[in-house]
Curated annotation (Swiss-Prot):
It catalyses: 6 Fe(III)-[cytochrome c] + NH4(+) + 2 H2O = 6 Fe(II)-[cytochrome c] + nitrite + 8 H(+). Residues 1-27 form the signal peptide. This is Cytochrome c-552. It comes from Shewanella oneidensis (strain ATCC 700550 / JCM 31522 / CIP 106686 / LMG 19005 / NCIMB 14063 / MR-1). It comes from the Bacteria. Heme c 4 binds at C271, C274, H275, H382. CDD domains: NrfA-like (cd00548).
Length: 467
């Protein structure tokens, strides 16, 4: 167990690290964060990884579905939520999102340092230099000049080698917790475990000795029900909902967990099998394609290695599943949006905490289940049956909350339906919540103009000392 650093030991470790770098040594013995260092040694892999830049479209998910603004009221995701794109944009997008705010210095801003954790091989470098106590300490802006290389080689590979590795110690602890230590895993299993470093549900610890640390809620298992019991047991919440005052859970991107529930996971078809297939270079050399993307874009190298059906057939099946998942998603959202507004009205009419507690528990559980299903972006392919099951329980629990709310509101003298304001667009939904988006956007633009060039200049100066 790592001992907690005192202020003196933290300062000393920082001084040692700075001296080490000034001497012109590598920043880390285990991690080379600069992806371009490997462009000659692993030419095909590097070039295909670089092609993730072609996945450049930014899709505004809140504009597509304004319900989510209300569902995340009081949380950063109500400000800005874009659909994910290629690995090449990981650092760019976390810098640019309104969720990270507009910090003016290293101690400023709304989010913790942990928000860098899935974005860059600079993260394992920093953990190796400073320990987890040093890395997780402080605000997100502290990492601006340090975390500049986007998701790449050293996130998944040992330094200068194709050998796979877990580069973040909290992931090793999570895999141990579910009885699948990386050190004992097969190569096939490791090809999914390295993806599970980021494509998972996680939270930031609130315990004083681990405050801000990333942890996966897997102590009781990886199903939605098991994680829910875990979170309830430690009385954890990500935020308090601005309307209903519910202690909420925000699911992240649990692809690994939902993949395990589906037919591919149960048959141990790895992430790499479908998203990073073996291909042949123009020179006739076989290599793993690092342009992580949709398997249908490389059908012959992915799906066709197992399936006898045509591409058109399988695309059709997948689209049907997506449509069914979307239908259930919207049903859950309709119930949840109404539940939040009805709960707000109940508070307004004088409801007590004791009266509201069972209602808020239902809302918490319903939205957690909705969120876990929709935050797993590939769930319609990975585990459509599980997605529909989970969304079905979300609808039921939200309906339970609304039945209780109807009874409580009647007790308070209100028998008419609670009016739901116009939330038909992102802008209208944000206005209902009183969000000053013009101010937030202006502050973000000023941050990008003032702070980002400084961060990049500091990073360039630091990396110039590397051998």
């Amino acid at each position: 167990m790592m001992k907690k650093m005192t202020g003196k030991t933290f300062a000393l470790s920082a001084l040692v690290a700075a001296s080490f770098m000034a001497a012109g040594a590598m920043a880390s013995d285990k991690t080379e964060p600069r992806n371009e260092v490997y462009k000659d040694k692993f030419k095909n892999q590097y070039n295909s990884w670089h092609d993730t830049a072609k996945s450049e479209e930014l899709v505004d998910a809140l504009e597509q579905d304004p319900n989510m603004v209300i569902l995340w009221a009081g949380y950063a995701f109500a400000k800005d939520y874009k659909a994910p794109r290629g690995h090449m944009y990981a650092v760019t997008d976390v810098r640019n999102t309104l969720r990270t705010g507009a910090p003016k210095n290293a101690e400023d801003g709304p989010l913790p340092m942990a928000c860098w954790s899935c974005k860059s091989p600079d993260v394992p470098r920093l953990i190796e230099e400073q320990g987890e106590d040093g890395y997780f300490k402080g605000k997100w802006a502290k990492g601006g000049p340090e975390v500049t290389n986007t998701i790449g080689c050293s996130d998944c590979h040992e330094k200068g080698s194709p050998k796979l590795r877990i580069s973040r110690p909290y992931v090793d602890r999570a895999l141990d917790a579910i009885g699948t230590p990386f050190s004992k895993a097969s190569k096939q299993d490791k090809e999914s475990m390295v993806c599970a470093q980021c494509h998972v549900e996680y939270y930031f610890e609130k315990k004083e000795d681990k405050k801000g640390f990333v942890k996966f809620p897997w102590d009781m298992g990886v199903t939605v029900d098991q994680m829910e019991v875990y979170y309830d047991g430690i009385e954890f919440s990500d935020w308090t909902h601005a309307l209903s005052k519910t202690p909420m859970l925000k699911a992240q991107h649990p692809e690994y967990e939902t993949w395990k529930m589906g037919i591919h996971g149960k048959n141990n078809v790895s992430c790499v099998d479908c998203h990073m297939p073996k291909v042949t270079s123009p020179e006739g050399k076989k290599f793993t394609d690092h342009k992580v993307g949709n398997p249908f874009d490389r059908f012959e190298e992915t799906c066709a290695t197992c399936h006898s059906q045509t591409k058109e057939f399988l695309v059709g099946v997948t689209n049907e599943r997506k449509a069914k998942v979307k239908e259930m998603k919207l049903k859950a959202e309709e119930q949840l949006v109404k539940a939040h507004f009805e709960a707000a009205k109940a508070w307004e009419l004088g409801a007590t905490e004791a009266e509201m507690k069972p209602i808020l528990t239902d809302i918490r559980h319903a939205q957690w289940r909705w969120d876990l299903a929709i935050a797993s972006h590939g769930v319609a392919a990975h585990a459509p049956e599980e997605a529909l099951r989970v969304l079905g329980t979300s609808v039921n629990k939200a309906a339970d909350a609304r039945v209780k709310l109807a009874q409580l509101l009647a007790k308070k003298g209100l028998t008419d339906p609670v009016a739901i304001p116009d939330i038909s667009t992102k802008a209208k939904a944000q206005a209902v919540l009183g969000m000053d988006m013009e101010k937030m956007n202006a502050e973000k633009e000023a941050f990008k103009k003032d702070m980002l060039p400084k961060w990049d200049a500091e990073a360039k100066k630091r990396e110039a000392t590397y051998k």
